[in-house]
Amino acid sequence: MKKSVLILSVTLFFSVLVTFNSCTSSGKASSGKMLKFNLEKGKGYDYEMIWDMNTKVMEQDTKIIIGGYYTMNVTDDDGKVRTISMEYKRLRMDMNVMGMNINMDSEGSTAESADSANFLGGMLSKVFSGIVNKPFTMKVDQEGNILEVTGFNKIVDGMLDSMDIAPEAKAQAQASMKDQFSDNYVKDQFAQIFNIFPNKEIKVGDKWEKSFSTSGKQAAQYNTVYTAKEIDGDFVTLVADTKISSQDEDGTKITGKQTGNVIVDSRTGLVVNSEFDQDMEVTASGMKVSVAGKGKIKGTAK
């Protein structure tokens, strides 16, 4: 039972990471602003995502803190679609579950231990360190739709090939990693940051809807209503209200909501700051998992 709760918690980490997976001013503006994904060709940008959540599985509480740090450079722009070269710079997770403290960090120790918590932490730290500082490519249109992600699958394959583990264990790890870390995984993770734009001029009070779906073991549909709350110089503050739902054939069910504020630089579409609260319930394999989380996203131009 202890093992199943631990596995479910780690699996939930990757699922919730996806949902994760969102200066100066010249005074309040009464006029509208064009709002679209408009990162500049030849420029670089950094994103930092922090997710702090509490889960409850069969009356067992789990505390998880997730950190992701990314850098991107816009290498091409055909007027409609931007090509972006991206790298994970650091990945970390601290988890307290069933009385065990599990720490995973791409910059931390990857030493293995007989202790189950340290062994898992060391193994996943190896996974994280094998992914960072390796570029992959993303194509994004002006509404923030992620059209294509390429190169991440090769990063995962290379990382697994470099690990000194038995062939049977490698095959199992490969099957798991292909589901948790893949081109589609990256696409799902960044959809919430990029897929927010109406691609038109907006004024305070305007509303629009955006939706996207995630794949994998815990696929879900995300439907968000965005409201323009304030325009201050070039910066637009949005209120986001998201409904989360799914019903898979295997019986997995996800329901939830997420609310928050997003500050966007209208000149580029860079998400300068975003803070949100999430409440979600996942039912899988007869177990019910309640999730209450807070997330922060910060973007900066290099």
Task: Cite the ranges covered by each PLM segment.
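Residues within alpha-helical transmembrane segments of multi-pass membrane proteins, especially transporters
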Residues: 11-13, 17
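Signature of exported/secreted
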Residues: 26-302
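Bacterial N-terminal signal peptides that target proteins for export
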Residues: 1-10
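C-terminal motif of bacterial Sec signal peptides marking the signal peptidase cleavage site
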Residues: 19-22
